[in-house]
Amino acid sequence: MFIVIEGCEGSGKSSLTQLLKDKLMAEGKAVVATREPGGSSLGERVRDWILDPSTTELSPYTELFLFLAARAQHITEKILPALELGKIVVCDRFHDSTIVYQGIVGGLGKEYVTNLCHSVVGQKKILPNLTCLLDIPADEGLKRKQQQKSFDKFENQSLAYHTKIREGFLSLAESRLDSYLVLDARQPIEESLNKVMTAYTELALCKSKER
């Protein structure tokens, strides 16, 4: 099973990813937790470069295709092998971050970027079984980030930018009610974890009945 955690800056994605991994492993499940950009040696190098605030010369298309290249390697090197072994993969960001950041808000077009994202998964159709969106007002998410000593390229963007990011994620969630779980990131993270576990259990039960 493939579970993706999405959300705006400061929503708690990384924390929920780790908590979910720990919870599933405590129940005896084989779990791989990973992130995007990243997840492979190539992906981590792309992450360091693109997110560096000093990297300002990239065109929107260059940025997009670097993200897609990192994802292609991530799928080949980590995600697909884990899924084929029957493991649960929990990923901090995936396709929808690219669709929102580069397509909807970045101006490259939702449909154009969506089609490119789908082309990256190839014939195996590596798509999430469940996407969990940690939703939080942009200003509150950015306040959480103020505790950091440094900020990456996207975290440095304006409040208006991050508000559009939130709206983009919510619009995707509304169009995919069958596979999206929207969580209030202002609630205790343990509550979000419990809701994700409930959704996972229901999904796992449905998949077992299909066999």
UniProtKB/Swiss-Prot annotation:
Keywords: ATP-binding, Kinase, Nucleotide biosynthesis, Nucleotide-binding, Transferase
NCBIfam families listed in its UniProt record: DTMP_kinase (TIGR00041)
Function field: Phosphorylation of dTMP to form dTDP in both de novo and salvage pathways of dTTP synthesis.
Gene Ontology cellular-component terms listed: cytosol
One Gene Ontology term from the biological process aspect of the record: dTDP biosynthetic process
Family, similarity comment: Belongs to the thymidylate kinase family.
A Gene Ontology molecular function term of the record: dTMP kinase activity
Chain positions recorded as ATP binding sites: G7, C8, E9, G10, S11, G12, K13, S14
Main enzyme class: transferase
Domain of life of the source: Bacteria
Entry protein name: Thymidylate kinase
Reaction it catalyzes: dTMP + ATP = dTDP + ADP
EC nos: 2.7.4.9
Any one Pfam family match given in the protein's UniProt record, by short name: Thymidylate_kin
